[in-house]
């Protein structure tokens, strides 16, 4: 069941990524590309899992562990997506490169595996398919596979930062301009973050199960199977939501929210009402329309 949901979620994620990358909304192109890349990373990691669970990885041993570094891109990409939408960011900054450090470190760690001969990879893949516990017992890189437990720590840090962004935005930005559309996008960001939070919680349960199984020397194949189902549902929800609710692709109105809308000059209500009152007084008291030759240009 979990595998079928995963396949559906990958399909929806790829469709969403295609729409995000090739739609003609230039204003929000930056945040759209971040989200598209996030879906592509999710899809690649999911395919990596499906290859192991189905046993098909034996036909593609060169792909073994290639999704491990990519996993460390997902939490920062989700955070940067929310940040870019709420703050109307339209380009990368040098400081954003710091988010790539975990990805780079994990990639370097697995260089010995990536450069290993196909014969040796085949032997490792067979052991992992036979017993998923070997995924943690076999040392594939410079460090032991305990390094994989850094992933839930990274995920927790980023999801807390993600919720903080949303909370700060709601607290500091009370503008009524485009309030309805802002509410739609903000609702999507909350659902997006809730789904990721749900994924992280199930992932933490999975990690606890793995630690218990390793300590008691039990097979963890069943734990992997059951924990994959809520993760699959979460990813399917995220990817299909965008296809059904395409209006969130529009992003937020392009205001400088970092400055609390102080310099935004869009229909200043007080000024607008004063101008309307001045026009009404002019028409009712001076009656310029009675003058011969009067035109609207005056």
Spans of model-derived segments:
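Membrane-interfacial helical/loop segments at transmembrane boundaries in membrane proteins
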Residues: 122-138
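The cytoplasmic-loop to transmembrane-helix boundary for the fourth helix
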Residues: 87-116, 126-127, 182-195
């Amino acid at each position: 069941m979990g595998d079928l949901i995963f396949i559906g979620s990958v399909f929806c994620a790829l469709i969403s990524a295609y729409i995000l990358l090739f739609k003609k909304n230039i204003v929000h192109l930056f945040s759209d590309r971040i989200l598209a890349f996030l879906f592509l990373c999710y899809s690649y990691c999911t395919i990596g899992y499906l290859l192991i669970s189905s046993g098909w990885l034996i036909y593609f041993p060169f792909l073994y562990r290639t999704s491990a570094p990519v996993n460390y891109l997902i939490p920062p990409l989700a955070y940067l997506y929310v940040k870019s939408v709420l703050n109307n960011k339209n380009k990368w900054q040098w400081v954003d490169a710091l988010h790539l450090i975990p990805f780079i470190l994990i990639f370097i760690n697995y260089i010995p595996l990536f450069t290993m001969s196909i014969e040796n990879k085949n032997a490792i893949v067979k052991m992992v398919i036979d017993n998923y516990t070997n995924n943690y017992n076999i040392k594939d890189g410079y460090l032991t596979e305990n390094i994989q437990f850094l992933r839930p720590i990274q995920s927790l840090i980023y999801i807390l930062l993600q919720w903080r962004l949303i909370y700060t935005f709601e607290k500091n930005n009370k503008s009524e301009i485009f309030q309805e559309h802002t509410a739609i996008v903000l609702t999507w960001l909350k659902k997006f973050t809730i789904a990721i939070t749900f994924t992280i919680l199930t992932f933490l349960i999975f990690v606890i199960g793995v630690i218990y199984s390793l300590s008691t020397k039990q097979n963890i194949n069943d734990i992997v199977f059951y924990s994959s189902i809520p993760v699959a549902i979460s990813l399917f929800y995220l990817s299909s939501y965008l296809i059904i609710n395409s209006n969130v692709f529009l992003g937020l109105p392009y205001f400088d929210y970092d400055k609390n809308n102080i310099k935004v000059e869009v229909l200043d209500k007080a000024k607008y009402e004063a101008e309307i009152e001045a026009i009404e007084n002019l028409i009712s008291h001076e009656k310029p329309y009675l003058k011969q030759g009067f035109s609207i240009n005056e």
